[in-house]
Every structure is written in structure tokens, then in C-alpha cells.
Amino acid sequence: MAKFDAHLKCSFCGKSQDQVRKLIAGPGVYICDECIDLCNEILDEELIDTQAKINNSPQVKKKLPTNNSDKSIPLELTSIPKPLEIKTFLDNQVVGQESAKKILSVAVYNHYKRLAWRLKEENKENDSNDLQATKLQKSNILLIGPTGSGKTLLAQTLAEFLDVPFAVADATSLTEAGYVGEDVENILLRLLQKSEMNVDLAQKGIIYIDEIDKIARKSENPSITRDVSGEGVQQALLKMLEGTIANVPPQGGRKHPNHDCIQIDTSQILFICGGAFIGLEDIVQKRLGKNSIGFTTNPDESKINAKKIIDSRDALKNLEQDDLVKYGLIPEFIGRIPVCAVLDRLSKETLESILTEPRDALVKQFKTLLSMDNVELNFEPESVEAIANEAFKRKTGARALRSIIEELMLDLMYTLPSQEEVKEFIITKKMVDKLFLSKIVKLPAGSQRIIKESA
């Protein structure tokens, strides 16, 4: 047996077992430690060459992380947009929600001032009074409102107005580290991409996290089982919301110990979280109902609470942090979002205004579309009211408006491109009441289009 072992040799270099330190056996093959080292050197050289080619390519050169700021942040107080100016811009695109717009305007204004103050402190010469300088901390914002009330639209409109990077993320795809899904650091990667991979600029940005209510834990009490997409995500977001040095993988996905990460300081990034929080008003109503029960309750106070309970739309105006805890948010997470804005449910009158008043109103959009076919589109006031009433019944907010108009305009937009002689079209209330029951009758060129209702 010893004689057989003496004839073992490396299948690659041919050296015998006595000539090498280690000989590793495989299925019918042997390799020595020297050949293993040589293979590792070859792989390392190829990896370096490949990485160099990637880094030298024009596409990647533009996306490499940098600390040089290309965009100018307002540094003087006089150049910072005032809250009234920010709200005026929001008014042009978002109808209603006055309280939420006021809160967002003040928060963005303070965000600009905090950046200017920090830069001013950094430019000061170091002296003995530096330790006494006031440190300005950020106040993250929580937007609560029913679906279609304008939470995402407010965030998108702010993105148009701001000179700082603005990124929108979805909380539903986030999971705790180590599980299938996105890490919370991928939120910062979106902001970094919006900043054209400029780290210094990204650290001054704003992030809007949508559907934040979807990461609420299943019950108020801590669970003994893993909640990887609920409480686990809240725990992972804590330090990011408060301010920390986060390691972000430049290519996205999961972090790898052998891959380089980009470090981003989140202490100056403003986070705005939004969610519908379906069922939260029931928790508030239940609490208000308990307060109005008992022999020692003030009768006048009981009447006030009873009125609050009747209208669920007003229930969220009495929201407290304990209600959010019962909904499923952990106290530590709520504490890091001190500012809370509640958006109102859209009324019929507000829906009518949304159809016609904003810059990108649906009526204006469809008028523009039909003008490309040389057709003038008009809506009777009664038809706008009927569309708003139908949208209000569907209880999906402003999103129902587009669905209704798309249904209403489908047949019309199907036939319009082929009817070059028609120059004008009027949407009437009867058409809204009887969707898809109208027929288009061809008329001589230059005349107004007539709608013939079917029986």
C-alpha cells in the first residue's frame, strides 16, 4: 500500500506526492498545492483585467461614486424657497389637503435651512466654542390618508420643485436582512442613482417611502416568530431614519462581504413615509368610544365624542401615537417620525376640482390628446359633476377619475382618428349616466358632433 502511495502525482504538473506539500485527491484526479496557487493567480489577474475594462467604459465612468457636488444647494437664507412659495407650487398641482401641504412646506424649508446651517458650521474655523454650537436635527414626516388622497402626488410634485435629490421607494418589497427581498439599503441606492452616484449630494436628499403601513406587524404584542417583512423591516429602518453610516452595495441586491460598498451618512437625509393605514380610524373610534363610557363622564364631553365617532373621516384628526402602536408600528419606529400629517378623504366637490383645475388635470390631458387629432373636446359642467359623483361612489379617491374617463372615452377615441371631418366633441351628463350606450353619427365637416342615445 505504501508503494502505491509513492507513485501518486499531480495530474497537472506531474510532480509526485514527495515533491509537494499537499496533494488533494478528486474523482480519478489529483492536484497539488502549487497548481492551486497558480490557478488562484490566474483568476485574480482575469478579475482585475475585467474590472478595469468595466471601470474604463464610458457608461460606468458616469456612475462611479464621487464626492463632488454638481448641483448647487441654496446656502444663503435669502435663496432658500419660503414655505409660502413651496405651498403655492403644490397648490398648482394638488387640490385640497391644506394641512398636509403646509406641513410639507415647512418641513422642506427647514430641511434647506438645516443643510445651510451645517455647511456654515463646517466652514467655520475650529475654536473653543465649537462644542457649544447648536446641532440641528431633522424631523421625519408621516403622511396618513386613504387611497387616492394625494400622498404620492404630493411627493412627486415636491420632486419637481426641489433642488435636492428626491427618491421614491416602496416598502412592500423590503425584507429583513438575510431573507428573499430587498434590503433597506436599496432605498439609499435609489437616492444615490438620482444623485448620479454623487455621495455628497445624496446625503442632502429627501426619500419618500410609500406603503409604509404594509410593514406593520400583525398584532400589537411582540411576536415570538419571525416577521421578516413587518417588524423586521421596521427594526432595520430605525438607524437609517435616525441617522447612521449605511453601507450601500453599488449594484443593488444583497450585500456581499467581498464586495465594496458605498458609505452614506443618513443624518441629513429627510424621510417622508406615507400609507393608507386601512382600519386605523376604527382603532381611534374605539378609543374615543371607551372615553365616553362611564358614570363619571361629563355629558357635554360625551356628546362631543359621540359626534366624532359618527363620522369616521374625522376620526384620524384625533390620532395619537398609541393608535399607531395598536395598528402594528413599534414605538421606536414611531418615535423617529415625530411629524404626522393626516390627509382628508376627497369629497365630491374636491373631485370636481381635481378634474379641471390642476396643471395636469384629466380634462386638460384628454383635451390635449384630442387636439392632436384636430378635435376640440369640451365637458359640460353637469358631466364633470356626474363623473365626480361616480368616482366618489367607488371610494378609491382620485384614481377612480381616470378609470371613469378612460371608460367614457374608449369608443370615442377609437373612432375619432378615422373621422377627420369632425372638429368638435361635447361630453354630456347623459353620456356619463349611460356609459357605452352612445353612438357617433357622422356629420358634414365643420359641424358639431351629435350624440344619439340608444334605447
Swiss-Prot record:
Alphabetical keyword list: ATP-binding, Chaperone, Metal-binding, Nucleotide-binding, Zinc
Domain ClpX-type ZB, residue spans: 1-51
Record keyword Oxidoreductase present: no
Gene Ontology CC: HslUV protease complex
CDD domains registered for this protein in UniProt: RecA-like_ClpX
GO molecular function per UniProt: ATP binding; ATP hydrolysis activity; ATP-dependent protein folding chaperone; protein dimerization activity; unfolded protein binding; zinc ion binding
Source domain of life: Bacteria
Residue numbers binding ATP: 146-153
Keyword Metal-binding: yes
InterPro entries recorded: AAA+_ATPase, ATP-dep_Clp_protease_ClpX, ATPase_AAA_core, Clp_ATPase_C, Clp_protease_ATP-bd_su_ClpX, ClpX_bact, P-loop_NTPase, Znf_CppX_C4
Residue numbers binding Zn(2+): 10, 13, 32, 35
Pfam families linked: AAA_2, ClpB_D2-small, zf-C4_ClpX
Endpoints of the signal sequence: none
UniProt-listed GO biological process terms: cell division; proteolysis involved in protein catabolic process
Family, per entry: Belongs to the ClpX chaperone family.
Summary of subunit composition and partner proteins: Component of the ClpX-ClpP complex. Forms a hexameric ring that, in the presence of ATP, binds to fourteen ClpP subunits assembled into a disk-like structure with a central cavity, resembling the structure of eukaryotic proteasomes.
Known function: ATP-dependent specificity component of the Clp protease. It directs the protease to specific substrates. Can perform chaperone functions in the absence of ClpP.
Official protein name in the record: ATP-dependent Clp protease ATP-binding subunit ClpX
Organism: Prochlorococcus marinus subsp. pastoris (strain CCMP1986 / NIES-2087 / MED4)
